[in-house]
Swiss-Prot record:
SUPFAM superfamilies reported for this sequence: Nucleotide-diphospho-sugar transferases (SSF53448)
Taxonomic lineage: Bacteria, Bacillati, Bacillota, Bacilli, Bacillales
Transmembrane segments: none
Name of the protein this chain belongs to: Uncharacterized glycosyltransferase EpsJ
GO MF term (any one): glycosyltransferase activity
E.C. number(s) listed in UniProt: 2.4.-.-
Assigned protein family: Belongs to the glycosyltransferase 2 family.
Length: 344
């Protein structure tokens, strides 16, 4: 029997959370599902826990593989999926019991390629609702989505694949897979392609997914040595996408402002969080300012741009003037990284 929905759950160092995640999937009011748990070479007991669950419920399938990263684990799940629809859940998150029933109902009734929802951001002491970043409760057609792509970074609707349900035919039609060379902020290049190919899209203003702010996750580690490499690969993938579809001119400002508001501060904060000497940190800042993605964004975004906040304007001005000492001082004083922890 072919399931209606395949739910792909990558697992890597999620032992404290994976049981709550799987339990939330087993409580779905939609029973016609398969749960594909992909053990991405995790060193903890997540794989063993998954196998125990698989013995108890035939809807669960466990795949073990050598560590290849989140994109690799998701691709493994996509290739194994049999459902009419495909959804993604991170192993340290969990979902509402009604999530997949609500999404499939809308997809079936409206012949949707993609249907999405709002989500809750949960920390240790609070839960905050994040609504959809596209107009909710009406079907968006392909021409409308093409127009939305021009503002994809401003609205952030391309962040996070786990708040969406995708028709499997879309993967086959567009040969959709995650770029396995990108190991940080993987979701947005994938979603650019997915939404470009989708014929019909709809958002529900309902909080059906709970994203846990996990201080032990990769995205929360203060210093990430590979961040620069993977953000540059992400940038190159986006530029290739825009060029392929003739969208470079229309989308350039959106991408440049996004880099100035989010990725440039992330790169600089990451450099200042490194254990290197002050001299090496300033050298790294100069290197970041030489990246093509940064040069283009800094050159073409005026610091008076209406979308920039005061602190973002200050950082941009310091970068335009290449004041590495003040950049270093700013981020050391600030002590936090701008941007979303699970930014896509």
């Amino acid at each position: 029997m072919i399931p209606l929905v395949s739910i792909i759950v990558p697992m890597y160092n999620v032992e404290p959370f994976i049981e709550e995640c799987i339990d939330s999937l087993l409580r779905q009011t939609l029973s016609d599902i398969e749960i594909i748990l992909v053990n991405d070479g995790t060193p903890d007991r997540s794989g063993e826990i998954a196998e125990d669950y698989a013995k108890r419920d035939a809807r669960i399938r466990v795949i073990h593989q050598a560590n290849g990263g989140l994109s690799s684990a998701r691709n493994t799940g996509i290739k194994a999926a049999r459902g009419t629809y495909i959804g993604f859940v991170d192993g340290d998150d969990y979902v509402s019991s009604a999530m997949f029933q609500r999404l499939t109902e809308e997809a079936e009734q409206n012949q949707l390629d993609i249907v999405g929802c709002g989500f809750y951001k949960q920390s240790s002491d609070r839960r905050t609702y994040v609504p959809p970043q596209l107009e909710a409760n009406r079907v968006l057609t392909k021409p409308e989505m093409t127009e939305q792509l021009k503002h994809a970074h401003e609205t952030r609707f391309i962040w996070y694949v786990w708040r969406y349900l995708y028709r499997r035919e879309l993967f086959e039609r567009a040969n959709l897979l995650f770029d396995e060379d990108i190991r940080f902020a993987e979701d947005s290049p994938f979603n650019l392609s997915a939404f470009r190919e989708a014929e019909r899209v709809k958002m529900l203003d309902e909080g059906l997914y709970i994203y846990r702010e996990n201080p032990n996750s990769l995205t929360e580690i203060p210093y990430k040595p590979a961040m620069d490499e993977h953000l540059q690969k992400q940038y190159q993938a986006k530029i290739a996408f825009y060029n392929h579809y003739g969208l470079a001119g229309a989308c350039k400002e959106d991408l440049n402002v996004y880099i100035c508001r989010h990725q440039l501060p992330m790169l600089l904060a990451n450099a200042c969080a490194s254990p290197n000497s002050p001299k090496d940190i300033k050298k790294k800042i100069r290197q970041i300012l030489s990246y093509d993605m940064v040069r283009q964004a800094v050159r073409h975004t005026p610091f008076q741009h209406e979308k920039l906040l005061r602190g973002e304007r200050l950082v941009l001005a310091l970068c335009k003037w290449r004041l590495t000492f003040l950049i270093k001082l700013f981020f050391e004083q600030r002590g936090t990284m701008k941007g979303s922890a699970k930014q896509a």
